[in-house]
Amino acid sequence: MGEKASKSKRKGLSAWQLTMMALGSVIGGSFFLGSSVAINAAGPSILLSYVIAGGLVYLILYALSEMTVGAPTVGSFSTFAARELGQGTGFVVGWLYWTGTVLSMSSEATAISLLVREWVPNVSIALLGGSIIVAVTLLNLLGADKIGKLASGLSAVKIFAIIFFILTAIVLIAGLMPGTPAIGAGELAREPIMPGGVKGIAGSMLLVVFAYAGFEIIGLAATEADNPTETIPRAIRYTVFSLVGLYILYAAVLLPLIPTAELSENVSPMVASLNRWGIGWAGTALNLVLISAILSAMLACIFGLGRMIRSLSDEGHAPHWLKDKRDVPYKGIIFSGLSMLIGLFFGLLFPRAYLVLITSGGFALIFTYAVIMASHIRFRNREGCPPGGICQMPGFPLTSWIALISLIIVLLCMPFIPGQTAGLITGSSMVVIYSLIYFVMSYMRRTRGNETAKKETSPRQFHPNYATELAQEIAERVDERNKDK
């Protein structure tokens, strides 16, 4: 009993560690670089996009929290989808999420390699990217507690960088920087509020929601949390308020510093805006922060992918050799790391095809969130509040339906974003492919099961047991001899 308790204590993640792991997974390259495209599309109305997306994240996380508190399970949303919407849905959403994340993280490894090459230009991208993936994979083999602490440290670095940028921007806006006049409303006063209209906001929504992507790691880590019924809801509150607050403050202080038309997806908006006001050293510093941001995102994502693979194999949705009953899912982690390596080298060999595949990452995440909401609606309709009456979703069922419909609209708006039409087509194709794979697997299992049943119920042919006959014959001869005597 004492050994079991110490083991539980050793691997239990606190609400703070879960929050920092979620922030580590969320605030990655898509925020530091990808926010440029979203701000270009929406202009100052990007603030509204961040608020709407924050509301969606709030509803998705609390839906996930209700189901997790009701039944903490490895695999989280894929297992809930299988239970509430059918095994086929669990199979498709699990593998679609895994595929999209593997592709996204292999591209993040390429992004880190490009940044690091500024200091070591003679080292190839293949070697740098491969080394990064191997290192992040090996670190994940250390277990949840050590990864939680490492992810917390890396997350703290990039959160500090965002806070530093916000404070520096406030100093510039207020005119407290020596030798620099007060900016005030600055460029914000000259920008139209909605330069792209409703279409611009709709087009930015996918990228903004994608900037929040990664929070689902809380659900994947639920079984390794210390006292999940209390820790998970607390971690969700911390995560939602931290993310929404940081993103809105970031956008609010950025807009006065630089015209949205000057933002480029190749340069962080923070670097571009500070360079514009003579703070050039920020570029090098924020490049280091960007590297730590992507590394922490990769650490958290491989953590989740390893547990997703273990869940899929436990459900019979992945090869049997990937099953792993140990606390740390070594097989799932190594398999995911190797898949990222394959993705990295595929991207270097076939860059055009790889770019098309990467665009499916956003689709995979939004599709996953839609399935979470659909699972939650079914869960509440069938089971009511979780055990103990822990109902956290405000305004159910209306809010759950609003979130589900909003996510579907975000998917349908993908063609409004340059390059994302391919993501919609590729992601939809993946759903079809994984659905076909599931149906083929189910058919083969049914066929195999029917053949086994026929063999078990068919009449058995009589085969003489020669050993029994010999024993009977010997016994008869012994009896005859006894009679003769």
Regions found by a protein language model. Name each.
Residues 79-82, 86, 118, 191, ...:
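TM-loop-TM module centered on a large, flexible mid-protein loop between adjacent transmembrane helices
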Residues 150, 322-330, 366-422:
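C-terminal membrane-solvent junction of multi-pass transporters and transport-like membrane proteins
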Residues 1-34, 40-45, 58-62, 74, ...:
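Membrane-interface "cap" regions at the ends of multi-pass membrane proteins
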Residues 32, 73, 96-110, 212, ...:
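Membrane-helix boundary/coupling elements in multi-pass transport proteins
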Residues 359-365, 393-485:
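A generic transmembrane alpha-helix motif of multi-pass inner-membrane proteins
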Residues 10, 23, 33-128, 239-242, ...:
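Extracellular loop-to-transmembrane helix junctions
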Residues 113, 126-183, 236-237, 358-371, ...:
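Membrane-interface loop-to-helix entry segments
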